Amino acid sequence: DLWAIVQDAIVKGAGGMDAHAASTMWWAHATSGRLPDGPALSALCGATERSAREAFNAQDVATTVWSLAALSSLRGMPLPRCYDDVWKIARDMQPGQFHNTGLCKLFHAYLMRKHGLSVGDKGEYPVWIINQAKDAWMMQVRERVTASSYQSEIAGVFRDDLNTNCEVEQVTDG
């Protein structure tokens, strides 16, 4: 099975992963909707923890935080220990270090965790998340950026699993 081969490759290659490789692996899992298996999860967390402090740039931080939040929120994966470590790095950064896409990812991750699709709000967030990151998120909406399939899927989880009345909206006034 191809997925088993991928998971074995993660376990074997995790020791040599840099920050970008670890971030990309989390993103690949999140966008494919597949959870890493036990050994691959441990190896990927280890690679993330090893490389995070020295080498994570703003893109790696935003991608990793969003990917882990999406896996938890949409697939029920318990948040691994490295999730809080990556948020700590984000707290130490300034919003100007992130492109708007990264700020949007951080705010999206914040919303997924804050509103507790699977974990509730237990984290500490950068003080600027409510201002600059939310502003980037709202700008994306105002510019009529199409809702991603993940945004629609999260709305579906709120609606179907949490029995909450919600829909994906788009701001139509300035």
List PLM regions with ranges.
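Eukaryotic RNA-binding helical-repeat scaffolds
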Residues: 1-174
